[in-house]
């Protein structure tokens, strides 16, 4: 690829996906003045299938397959993802090459009536499509009625405003990026709801043999975020985590030490397996795998085997 060719970003058409694509475009052009960057928009299966829970129709990979095909066929050079939506495995020839600085990784409590989970009345209806959020909500408040909630951020907020739910749970990062932070009644601390693996971080997937592109992307990589996300993903990879199972994790870096907390739960919140681990940042991925093995030994293995068998 010559220096003159534009960089083509494959992206979904949802407002948040377009925000992420423009974020990467702007960062590339700021780092490399004069570089041409184009957006190649496309619709994925995940954008089309809105009447079925993600866990039942193939999981998060539904949002990335078309983008990956475009890269493999040479119609696009890179794809920008919310890290929480990036599957464990990549097609041969593709991989995660850059992780950008993380936005707020917490879940957001959104309601027109109540300020937080504790204020919800008995039997309140809460909307989420995440088994991870569902199991933690049900553990804290078994009385709550959890209803499926699909669609992009604007669609979900409209369903709340139409009175279908007393509250909904979204990612803080998505609301902040779309300029909708005023809809966040309260951020849910990790102690109450562990976020998804990589939540709040933007990752860039590209062809592994594209050395020119990888060099262009180097200034966008944020080492601290990358270490945190790689630690969380190593844990998730060892658990073979996907949409079908409730897995939460959250990591922090303090100096040269990284700390990781994670959980695996029954969807109804009746059983929650939790653990944490800490060690040198240089061992981030090994620590993630270590914590996964700890969770598996503590009972997560049985939960995961049953849920995957039912999926």
Swiss-Prot record:
GO terms for biological process: protoporphyrinogen IX biosynthetic process. Its cofactor is dipyrromethane. Keywords: Porphyrin biosynthesis, Transferase. The modification S-(dipyrrolylmethanemethyl)cysteine is found at residue 243. It holds the Pfam family Porphobil_deam. The keyword Phosphoprotein does not apply. GO terms for molecular function: hydroxymethylbilane synthase activity. InterPro entries: HemC, Porphobilin_deaminase_cofac_BS, Porphobilin_deaminase_N, Porphobilinogen_deaminase_C, Porphobilinogen_deaminase_C_sf. Monomer. Belongs to the HMBS family. This is Porphobilinogen deaminase. It comes from Aliivibrio fischeri (strain ATCC 700601 / ES114) (Vibrio fischeri). The gene is hemC.
């Amino acid at each position: 690829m010559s220096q003159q060719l534009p960089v083509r970003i494959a992206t979904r058409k949802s407002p948040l996906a377009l925000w992420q694509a423009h974020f990467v475009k702007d960062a590339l052009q700021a780092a490399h003045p004069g570089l041409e960057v184009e957006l190649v928009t496309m619709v994925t299966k995940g954008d089309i299938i809105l009447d079925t829970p993600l866990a039942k129709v193939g999981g998060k990979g539904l949002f990335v397959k078309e983008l990956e095909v475009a890269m493999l066929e040479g119609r696009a050079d890179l794809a920008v993802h919310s890290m929480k939506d990036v599957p464990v495995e990549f097609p041969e020839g593709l991989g995660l090459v850059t992780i950008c600085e993380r936005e707020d990784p917490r879940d957001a409590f959104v309601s027109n009536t109540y300020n937080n989970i504790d204020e919800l009345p008995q039997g309140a209806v809460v909307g989420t499509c995440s088994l991870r959020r569902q199991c933690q909500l049900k553990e804290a408040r078994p009385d709550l009625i959890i209803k499926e909630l699909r669609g992009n951020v604007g669609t979900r907020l409209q369903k709340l405003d139409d009175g279908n739910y007393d509250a909904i749970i979204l990612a803080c990062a998505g609301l902040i990026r779309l300029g909708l932070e005023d809809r966040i009644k309260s951020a849910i601390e990790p102690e109450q709801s562990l976020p998804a693996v990589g939540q709040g971080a933007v990752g860039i997937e590209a062809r592994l043999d594209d050395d020119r592109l990888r060099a262009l992307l180097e200034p966008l990589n944020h080492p601290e975020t990358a270490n945190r996300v790689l630690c969380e993903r190593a844990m998730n990879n060892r658990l073979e985590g996907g949409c079908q199972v409730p897995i939460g994790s959250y990591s922090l870096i303090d100096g040269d030490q990284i700390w990781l907390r994670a959980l695996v739960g029954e969807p109804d919140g009746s059983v929650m397996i939790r653990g944490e681990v800490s060690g040198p940042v240089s061992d981030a991925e090994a620590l993630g795998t270590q914590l996964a093995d700890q969770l598996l030994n503590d009972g997560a293995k049985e939960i995961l085997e049953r849920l995957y068998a039912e999926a």
